[in-house]
Amino acid sequence: MKLYIIQNLNSHWKNNSSKNIITKLAHKFNLEIPQYKETGKPILNTGYISISHSNQFLVVIYSNQPIGIDCEIIRPIQQSLIDKLKLDKLNPILDWCKRESVIKLLDDKSYLLKKELNEYYFETVSFNPLLCIVLASNKAIPTIEIIHLDSELNFINLTQ
C-alpha cells in the first residue's frame, strides 16, 4: 500500500486539479490511471485508489484492498456543525476524517451522519502536526509506504 502525499508549495489545490496531477503521478511511478464513476469516485481495473485534498496537500492511496482516505487541515469546526453531525467534541476533525474516509471507501455519503463506524478499520497517518490523514478499510490495513512529493512530483521525503 503506497500513500503519495503531494504538496503544492505555492498555493492550495483547486477542485478537479487532482485529475491532472494523478495522471502525471501514474506515469512517473508506472501506476494505473484511474477512471471516475459518475459520483466522482476514482476506480481502477486492478486494485483500489482513494484521493483527498485539503489546502496545499493532495493525498493519493493505491492499495490492493478496498480503501478510503480523507485529509483535513486541523482547524476549529463550528459548534453548530459539531452538534448537527454529532461529531466527537474532543476531536471533531478526526471524527470528520473517519466518516469521510468511509464515505470514500463505500461511495456512500450517508456515512457523514453515522456516529458508529466500529465495523471498519482505521489508520491515522502522522505526517504533519497540522494535517489529519485517516485511512478506512473493511480489512486490517497493512504497512503503508509514504512518498512525499512536491507539485512537480519531485521527492521531498520517502518514509517507510
Language-model region placement:
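Core catalytic alpha/beta fold that binds nucleotide/phospho-ligands
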Residues: M1-Q160
